[in-house]
Amino acid sequence: MLVSRRLTGARARAPLLASLLEAWCRQGRTTSSYSAFSEPSHVRALVYGNHGDPAKVIQLKNLELTAVEGSDVHVKMLAAPINPSDINMIQGNYGLLPKLPAVGGNEGVGQVIAVGSSVSGLKPGDWVIPANAGLGTWRTEAVFSEEALIGVPKDIPLQSAATLGVNPCTAYRMLVDFEQLQPGDSVIQNASNSGVGQAVIQIASALGLKTINVIRDRPDIKKLTDRLKDLGADYVLTEEELRMPETKNIFKDLPLPRLALNCVGGKSSTELLRHLAPGGTMVTYGGMAKQPVTASVSMLIFKDLKLRGFWLSQWKKNHSPDEFKELILILCNLIRQGQLTAPAWSGIPLQDYQQALEASMKPFVSLKQILTM
């Protein structure tokens, strides 16, 4: 099934010891200020003390909230998604690993409850998101340092704010940082139904770019295809269809893509390279297939293709906090204008985290699992 859509169409939019956690707090508070205690508390968090299967190592723990001082900010978490990077971090397969024990979650939105005397950029009532990965958002409350947070406007949907700081940021940076694309140019991507993939479709459309979106075949293929079209996808095809000779007919109506976005690797990434324009760039930001990216010598010599990688955490290290805040504001404007919506999602109460973890790790995941506090 090969589906096209014009840009002018409609857009819808096992146990942990308390002493371990106490030792964690004694090590110094780099991102948060929780310690464990034995009696029940209204402050709860999903904690892991070693790396492994999230379903086995994650536990719902009662934690103690420390006093707010100086540059501290007391935050009540509102919602936090479960992303692939969260799972990889818990498994120990990620480029950034917090000290153990740790609270899970890299992304989410919370509301400021109180601030310390030295806090100048935030006030009670403000919405905030993490400035960097590893903050530990799967909890009901926390005391963070002001520099660990970024304020976001409250006039955007809660689920959009909760999923703002990772996937849309990754999508935007990949679209604008590697090739100087102009309206009418095209982009090809795999894993198009992922959080990043859905953001790519919408942001590209807002920039006047056309998208060729590759997905794995599945039982509900038409439902998924229709949803991606509603987001603004120009073409949606399966991995198998991408290999068919008929695919070349797409390029009668649009130029060969100069940018490919790869989250899969293996044969899928090789197919993306095959359809790139000479001199084009493939950016790899994930490896779902757990297979290497392979490029033939002829692709590199005769087509002069470029292979790059992108990791948002590294981008943040290379850029100032103000530049990240500017990026967040750009994306918030797109949300306000109806040009960027949150991925299809399912809200799960924090205490039902096992259900959310299981759902997020199933094949052909169609709904983003968001923990609600």
Curated annotation (Swiss-Prot):
NADP(+) binds at residues 167, 193-196, 216-218, 285-288, 310-312, 368. One of its GO terms (molecular function) is enoyl-[acyl-carrier-protein] reductase (NADPH) activity. One of its GO terms (biological process) is fatty acid biosynthetic process. The modification N6-acetyllysine is found at K61, K252, K267. The active site is at Y94. Residues 1-53 form a transit peptide. The keyword Transcription does not apply. GO terms for cellular component: membrane; mitochondrion; nucleus. Catalyzes the NADPH-dependent reduction of trans-2-enoyl thioesters in mitochondrial fatty acid synthesis (fatty acid synthesis type II). Fatty acid chain elongation in mitochondria uses acyl carrier protein (ACP) as an acyl group carrier, but the enzyme accepts both ACP and CoA thioesters as substrates in vitro. Displays a preference for medium-chain over short- and long-chain substrates. May provide the octanoyl chain used for lipoic acid biosynthesis, regulating protein lipoylation and mitochondrial respiratory activity particularly in Purkinje cells. Belongs to the zinc-containing alcohol dehydrogenase family. Quinone oxidoreductase subfamily. Homodimer. This is Enoyl-[acyl-carrier-protein] reductase, mitochondrial. It comes from Rattus norvegicus (Rat). The gene is Mecr.
